[in-house]
Structures are given as structure tokens and as C-alpha cells.
Amino acid sequence: MITQTLEMNQEDQTASYQMIKEEHLASLVITSQTLAGSRVLKSTYQQVVFSDCVFYAVEFQGVVFDNCVFENCNFEFSHIRRCKFKNCSFVNCTWKATSTIDTVYADCTLDSFLSRLTESNGNEMAFSFDIALQIAA
């Protein structure tokens, strides 16, 4: 995992930008985390719950989310590119001026706004179904 933090100081304002690359997290609950203007690249998150997190103007590229939950998260001005979400759910999230491009959403529960975002730009929605057939003897 590579995490690089860049700091900018301008008069009384301080901002911290992170580049997160090849991070692999599993079976965690992440609460009230804020990333602003950061990049998350080629990382994997399995069974992670993101609760009350702010991803403001974050670029997600080549990231895999497997069995993750996003609740009350803010994705304003973020860009989701070439990512894969599998068995994920999104509850009460904010998507103002967010883009999603060439991203796969497989067996995910999407809120209505994210569902509309995925209708163009090369995104893919995939759903699997279990079918049980009874065979007469």
C-alpha cells in the first residue's frame, strides 16, 4: 500500500490531499472519515462499512469494492472511473455533481440518484438470480 499526503498551507487555511494506491482493507467499519481532493487508485475493499464518510472531490480509479456498505456518505464532486462494485449497497448518500464512468455495479443495491448516474458513460449493471426448479419424480 502506498499512501502519500500532500499538504497545502495558504494563509489561515490548511488542506491535506492523499494519494492512496494499492490499499487492501477487509472486514472493517470506517466511520466519519473525510477525504477531500484525494485520489484512490487500484485498491481493494472487502466487507467494509463506510458510515458518515465524506469523499469530497475524490477520484476513485480502478478500485474494487466487494460486499461493502455505504451509508450516509457524501460523494459530492467525486469521479468514479473503471471501478467495480460487487454486492454493495448505498443508503442515503449524496451524489451532487458526481460522475461514474466505465464502472461495473454487480448485484448492488443503488439509491435512485446513483441508479440514474449509471445509465450512461459506459457503466454496466449486472444482476444474478438464483433459480430453483423442482423435478417431478
Task: Give the predicted meaning of each segment.
Residues 2-137:
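Tandem repeat scaffolds
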